[in-house]
């Protein structure tokens, strides 16, 4: 460790590294970012600065030295021919100039050289994909994944308009890279329909695109109206292009959708002007974008400049500034969710931000309101967090009207009047009354939603009607409804009633993960429900599972495992499940295939191996293992290659079994796992 660094400095580094890694997983693997892009950029920049000052702290799995996230075990992993890298960022013209000067030094060129011709492109906020062609025929399409290994999504990508399946006259291997996105218009239309049906809303267009592309059923993907823009080539046999601008022309000539906002210019001053003009125009884009990308135009110079461990030296992302506006906080309401959580909501004087009208913003919890000292009548500064979700940044106290008073958080449920509770150490306040009409409504609405049991025809209005008339108290009562009862409701009718009953009947044999999600357990959404279904295969097996067995499922932490176990053991939950079964609920059981053989095992990889570490990590995770960066008492095995270093010492200190590649092959063979490049051997440990 550097002598100038104190133990506290190193502790702060480890904490920051863990925080950035957590946000990477939320963004790349769970499609659920918790902070805005600019907040993430600030954290990542701080971590890079610390690693630049203390290179002895840096390990291979540093979250700012690696790319993307682990491929999902739900899709077949596929290795890219050439890595799909990330991009480094700049935030103003001075930083752009410094980047050009650094690039000039790496190429042994003067900073003002005429060779510095750049192509500017829009940085679309979507999901990166790679299309692989062999002799002109599309073989597969994959997500970026960790940059080396992605998820096979060929059938899903082929639902996107404008994807050529054949390229006449082309020989050899070709990789075409682009961005899949959900347009702002389709995002708004989806959420408008979801709101009408009472189903979950998409958080932002990027999440919508990622979720649609990762649908197992391509026909579901097709309904989301995804689009794509293509902008680069990886392997490019037979493509005669000398510059990035010629690559874009070649792509357009072959029928690939390309951006109409690309320009070619000379030097960083012109690049900064391009960025300024695109910043002003971004509200007119049909897609969300978080910046521009400035690329060195000559491909020969790109190859000469090369790459760092995570990004090309010849390209940079120039991030858009975050647009902020002032508006007035007109009122604060408190809603009650399906778990009983009280959710405060700010109602704002409508303002236009980045092309859409903002009139509401979440206020999270009581502490958030108190810390910001938010008062009705205040002038507040609002932005779109991550470009989409409205967020109050601060109060303009100098504009505060006289006689305003602090907001008083309710001590009784605004829906049922029951006294609310707040556990020590918990930021959230809850209504503990299970009969609370708001909770009942939200639980039933969630149960029938698109992401749960997907009962079409039961929207928000019908849920309100069946609750208010006393026909339904919980989800199981839905399956006891009769045609006469439904037809007798306002705006009912025989035809509508029969349609609802048919949809309810069809839902009885939905896949197991849908029922798990529909039960509405805390910490369980679509992704965790699918993981639980894959791991346990049947509802009975899940009901018998211990917290330790649940925690062993990839993606589950201890908090989630304890929460799920407690929820499933609750007498009210058990009664609901039994009543659903009595009504004929028989979910389709899930085959426990890949993703279970190594469940419960925690691996750490270190040293030089015969295959890329990222590929081995992805393949182990696809078989159900968890791969982490540090050796602890919870580590099942350390996989050690040449020059293993301090992790090997730590494993021996903790008596963690150590495997070389041959011993790993033996373990995998015994578990029924075949991983390419890993052969079984009689060897056991090193």
UniProtKB/Swiss-Prot annotation:
Entry keyword annotation includes Nucleus:
no
One matching Pfam family, short form? DNA_ligase_aden
- Annotated catalytic residues: 123
Which SMART domains would you find in this protein's record? BRCT, LIGANc
Tell me which residues make up the BRCT domain.
593-681
BP terms from Gene Ontology: DNA repair; DNA replication
Keyword Ligase among record annotations: yes
Q: Which Gene3D superfamilies match?
A: 5' to 3' exonuclease, C-terminal subdomain, 6.20.10.30, BRCT domain, DNA ligase/mRNA capping enzyme, Helix hairpin bin, Nucleic acid-binding proteins
Q: Which SUPFAM superfamilies match?
A: BRCT domain, DNA ligase/mRNA capping enzyme, catalytic domain, Nucleic acid-binding proteins, RuvA domain 2-like
UniProt-recorded Gene Ontology molecular function terms: DNA ligase (NAD+) activity; metal ion binding
Q: Its catalytic activity?
A: NAD(+) + (deoxyribonucleotide)n-3'-hydroxyl + 5'-phospho-(deoxyribonucleotide)m = (deoxyribonucleotide)n+m + AMP + beta-nicotinamide D-nucleotide
Determine the domain of life of the protein's source.
Bacteria
| UniProt-annotated binding residues for Zn(2+) | 413, 416, 431, 436
Q: Which residues bind NAD(+)?
A: 37-41, 86-87, 121, 144, 179, 295, 319
Role of this protein: DNA ligase that catalyzes the formation of phosphodiester linkages between 5'-phosphoryl and 3'-hydroxyl groups in double-stranded DNA using NAD as a coenzyme and as the energy source for the reaction. It is essential for DNA replication and repair of damaged DNA.
This chain belongs to the protein called DNA ligase 2
Lineage runs: Bacteria, Thermotogati, Deinococcota, Deinococci, Deinococcales
């Amino acid at each position: 460790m550097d002598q100038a660094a104190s133990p506290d400095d190193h502790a702060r580094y480890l904490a920051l590294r863990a925080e950035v890694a957590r946000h990477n997983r939320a963004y790349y693997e769970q499609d659920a970012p918790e902070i805005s892009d600019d907040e993430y950029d600030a954290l990542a920049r701080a971590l890079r600065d610390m690693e630049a000052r203390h290179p002895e702290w840096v390990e291979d799995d540093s979250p700012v030295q690696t790319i993307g996230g682990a491929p999902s075990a739900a899709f077949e992993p596929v290795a890219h021919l050439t890595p799909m890298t990330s991009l480094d960022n700049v935030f103003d013209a001075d930083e752009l100039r410094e980047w050009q000067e650094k690039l000039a030094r790496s190429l042994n060129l003067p900073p003002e050289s005429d060779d510095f011709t750049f192509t500017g492109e829009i940085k679309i906020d979507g999901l990166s994909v790679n299309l692989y062609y062999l002799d002109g025929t599309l073989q597969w399409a994959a997500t970026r994944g960790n940059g080396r290994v992605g998820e096979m999504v060929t059938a899903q990508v082929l639902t996107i308009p404008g994807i050529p399946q054949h390229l006449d006259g082309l020989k050899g291997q070709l990789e075409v890279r682009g961005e899949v996105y959900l347009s702002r218009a389709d995002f708004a239309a989806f959420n408008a329909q979801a709101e009408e049906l009472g189903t979950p809303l998409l958080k932002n267009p990027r999440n919508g695109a990622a979720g649609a592309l990762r649908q197992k059923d391509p026909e579901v993907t097709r309904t989301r109206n995804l689009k794509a823009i293509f902008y680069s080539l990886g392997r490019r046999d037979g493509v005669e292009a000398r510059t990035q601008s010629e690559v874009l022309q070649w792509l357009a000539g072959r029928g690939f959708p390309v951006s109409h906002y690309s320009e070619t210019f000379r030097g960083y001053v012109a690049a900064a002007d391009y960025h300024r003009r695109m910043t002003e125009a971004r509200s007119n884009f049909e897609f969300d974008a978080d910046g521009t990308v400035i690329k060195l135009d000559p491909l020969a110079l790109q190859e000469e400049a090369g790459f760092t461990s995570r990004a090309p030296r010849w390209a940079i992302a120039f991030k858009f500034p975050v647009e902020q506006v002032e508006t007035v906080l007109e009122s604060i309401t408190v809603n009650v969710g399906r778990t009983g959580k009280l959710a405060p909501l700010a109602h704002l004087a409508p303002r236009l931000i980045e092309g859409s009208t903002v009139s509401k913003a979440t206020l999270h919890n009581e502490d958030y309101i108190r810390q910001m000292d938010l008062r009705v009548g205040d002038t507040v500064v609002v932005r779109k967090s991550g470009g989409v979700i409205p967020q109050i940044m601060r109060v303009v106290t100098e504009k505060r009207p006289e006689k305003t008073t602090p907001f008083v958080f309710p001590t009784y449920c605004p829906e049922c009047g029951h006294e609310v509770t707040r556990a020590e150490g918990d930021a959230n306040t809850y209504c503990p009354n299970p009969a609370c009409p708001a909770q009942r409504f939200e639980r039933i609405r969630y149960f029938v939603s698109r992401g749960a049991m997907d009962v079409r025809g039961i929207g928000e209005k019908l849920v309100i009607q069946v609750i208010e008339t006393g026909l339904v108290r919980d989800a199981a009562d839905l399956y006891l409804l009769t045609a006469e009862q439904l037809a007798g409701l306002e705006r009912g009718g025989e035809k509508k009633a029969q349609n609802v009953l048919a949809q309810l009947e069809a839902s009885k044999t939905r896949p197991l993960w849908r029922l798990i999600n529909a039960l509405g357990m805390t910490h369980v959404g679509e992704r965790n429900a699918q993981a639980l279904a894959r791991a346990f295969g049947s509802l009975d097996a899940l009901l018998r599972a211990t917290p330790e067995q649940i925690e062993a499922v990839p993606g589950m932490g201890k908090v989630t495992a304890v929460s799920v176990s407690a929820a499933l053991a609750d007498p009210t939950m058990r009664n609901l499940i039994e009543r659903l079964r009595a009504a004929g609920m028989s979910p389709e059981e899930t085959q426990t295939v890949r993703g279970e053989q190594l469940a419960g095992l925690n691996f750490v990889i270190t040293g030089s191996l015969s295959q890329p570490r990222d590929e081995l990590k992805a393949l182990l995770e696809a078989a159900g293992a968890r791969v982490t960066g540090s050796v602890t008492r919870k580590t099942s095995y350390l996989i050690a290659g040449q020059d293993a270093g301090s992790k090997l010492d730590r494993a021996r200190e903790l008596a963690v079994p150590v495997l070389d590649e041959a011993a790993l092959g033996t373990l995998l063979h015994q578990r029924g796992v075949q991983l390419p490049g890993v052969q079984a051997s009689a060897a056991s440990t090193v």
